[in-house]
Amino acid sequence: MKILFCSAEAYPFSKTGGLADMAYFLPKSLKSIKHEVVIITPYYKQIAKHHDKMVELARFPVRFGGIETIVILFGLNHEGIDYIFVQNMHYFERELLYGYSDDAERFACFSYAILESMKALKFYPQILHINDWQTGMFPYLLDTHYRHQNDQYYSIHTLYSIHNLEYQGSFDTYTSRFFNSDFNYTYIHFDRVNFMKAAIERATKINTVSPTYRNEVMTSEFGFTLDGALKNRAKDFVGILNGIDTELYNPNTDRLIDVTYNKKTYRKGKLLNKEAILHHFNLDVDLNQPLVVYIG
């Protein structure tokens, strides 16, 4: 299958959390079983250091909400995977990836740019895999603005992956103008534009990071007010447990740990790494006491 993997961040080029890691290891795994996978992500300021290895693929205007801006697509092959970077200096080349007052506008631009890139590059995926709130408006825009344009748009299926339901992309209603439409039940939630709700309502299929989390987010306690929308899509909503990239996180080659080890030397290696962590955090060096390390 042709898969276009859309992510607001992608390791090793940009990262604030686990989404970037998933954008690294999942496409590699899909390619290993003979799928054609392309990753598309914003060209952030920190990505400029890789620019010399890129080639320009296309440039075109993007129009939305009375705004017209130019985006440039750059391509790079990294570890056998094709990456496309969406460059717009105004929206993306900033110090941080997120957290700006115009985030709705920024990721509206990203959404339109990707949908327009399909025409520019003549690459129409069978599966458009979108992730978290930043890409949540894709299914709505695809349905309302693009499917009617040609058979290739019409036949695209969308998979929406929820990594953290708490961050929904909720904005004032004035941002609806960026989607060239009147208010629509798809994306309005408690009188606000909600990117994640739009994806839950419109995506062909929905998944999240584990079967347990899938069940949790359909409860009022952990659903962050979207449990009702998820229950309505329950038959299309699955939990698939995230794994790790065993090449990237290989203790035999990992340069980020003090002592590497393998299945023959793991007892000594883990003990030495435990000792190093205790020293690093100025804790009592008692190797007989359990040490619990949590990253989250």
Predicted segments with their positions:
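Catalytic cores of nucleotide-sugar-dependent glycosyltransferases that transfer UDP/GDP/TDP-activated
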Residues: M1-G296
